């Protein structure tokens, strides 16, 4: 069995980061126009910008238009349903960050920032599917850093004096790893995402 569209895009992003433009990424981008879903659209845009792939492979404007069409009326973006999800909204912001000042992107970009600020928990962290977790907070920090926002000082993202950086560090365990949830043990996915976020 082949890779899913989202997995193909993830692999292509990793390969581009490691070795620059490559045939696998170019093939993936050629197919990207047929992919559906907010995450595929976000990853397509990130991949396009990883190594300045040409528009001939996949139109940036078309991907941006598709991505913007997934915005939920009540705010943010989600895999499904009518309520925004911090994880997905953050991934979209990361993808759109190079275009945040474009007239067709800026209004949605600012609304999504406002949405994330409004759903930030008192701990400084973020929840997905009702559970506060390290990975959601990490995705938001990556999005804010990509957008040039100082998550430790911007008042929109300080709750009870705590930032998303504070929330992420609360998941750190004595073995150096990071847990998925507050009372959990170190988790590989949480650790990778936390380190990526803190380095962003």
Short names for language-model regions:
Residues 119:
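Conserved helix-to-beta-strand junction in the class I
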